[in-house]
Amino acid sequence: MIRLKYLIYIVPLLFAGPLSAQEESLSLSEALDKALQNNYGLIISRAEVEAAGINNSWGNAGRYPSIGFDASDNNSYELLDPVYTNRLSAGIGLDWVLFDGFRVQFTKNRLENLEKLTSGSLAVAIENTIGDIILGYYNVLLQQERLLVLNKVMDLSRDRYQYELKRQSLGGSVTYNVLQAQNVYLSDKASHMNQEVVVRNAIRNLNFMMAEDPGKTWTFEDPFVPDTSSYRLDDLVSKMKSDNQILKNQYTHLILQENQTSLQESAYYPTLSLGTGIDYSHSLSRAGGSSLTTNAIVPYGNIRLSFDIYQAGVRKRSLKVARINEEAARVEVRQMEHALTNELFNLYDYYNVRVELLNVADESLEAALLNLSISEEKYRSGVINSFNYRDIQLIYLHSAFQRLQAIYNLIDSRTQLTRITGGFLSTGEQDF
């Protein structure tokens, strides 16, 4: 099991009111915990890390000798001069490469870095899962809030429809006005029903990321509020360069290319190997009425030195390619640093703009609510007509949706800033 370091990022939370007895409560931290334990992608990544850890051994690197046992039983019969021969042999031998140009050490370093890269990939998967859960959780809250807004607009439309029906029964309204109010109400009802489906889909998507049953329902504890605290760009850049996991993985990839270059250089060294063991043989020959039996036990020990003098330029070309790949990996590191810095600057600008957009959306919604309250009285008193009243309802609907989206966008920006600066990984250790 790989030990990874992480910090769960949670926007400031206020606990909700009484919970439904039929539904289990779910906070953002609980959703993160479920996903980190059960997410399908993380389970696969953990298995890959475990496999890389098993491969990272001195045995795979070639440090230790190999021991083998051989046995054979050969029988032959000469037809022209009848002779029957039986040969039984067995042997055990040890082969050990004592020196091969430090290839064993270079191979072990490569295996260690492959395990490190696999662990880094798991860390990236954890970061992505945390970010997806945060946005998935708040997407559910966003869709639920939109449903509440649509419910309010539908209630207003229903009240207007019932008002027109009552006026018609008293002779104060014509069929045209009633039908218009009915169409508006039915349209708002359809929007409300569609939004209910959107809410259920958002919950199912969240359940999938947590590996929960699709039909599982929750009472979501966390409020739909953003954290609007400010950032310093210099601090973000510093954290990104030191803690960004994708950049760390790119550094590990560069080290792997350096290992590959060292492995190719080791091909220019001689190889010194040891072979030792013991052989046993038993031979039986029968010709006519006589037989001959021989037995032998032969221990042996050999040292072999080999050196490739010429390989038609294979080693030279392989080393040249390895050095080219190493230099390309260095360029990729610089490219990654530049790309991440650009992305960070963009995210920082978006975050600051979205803080201001939220303030604008708050003012817009406040004005729309006041206008809606005033227009309802004016509509019933006949100062404005049904078309004006409907326009004001739509303005409120747009303003409410715009504010909810502004909140979600701000949460998204904060989540992306935390991800790119390595904020989901910290000094606290946790087993995954």
What spans do the regions from the language model cover?
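Bacterial Sec-pathway N-terminal export signals of envelope proteins
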Residues: 21-68, 174, 214-255, 308, ...
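Small/polar, glycine/serine/threonine/aspartate-rich low-complexity segments that form flexible
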Residues: 22-24, 70-100, 107, 220-230, ...
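Bacterial N-terminal signal peptides
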Residues: 8-16
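A short glycine-centered flexible hinge/capping loop motif at secondary-structure junctions
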Residues: 168-172, 379-383, 420
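Short flexible linkers and secondary-structure junctions
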Residues: 22-139, 175, 272, 276, ...
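Sec/SRP-type N-terminal targeting helices
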Residues: 43-47, 60-61, 84, 98-126, ...
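Acidic, low-complexity, intrinsically disordered peripheral segments
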Residues: 402-432
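Periplasmic alpha-helical coiled-coil/stalk elements that build and connect Gram-negative outer-membrane
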Residues: 125-241, 347-350, 354, 396
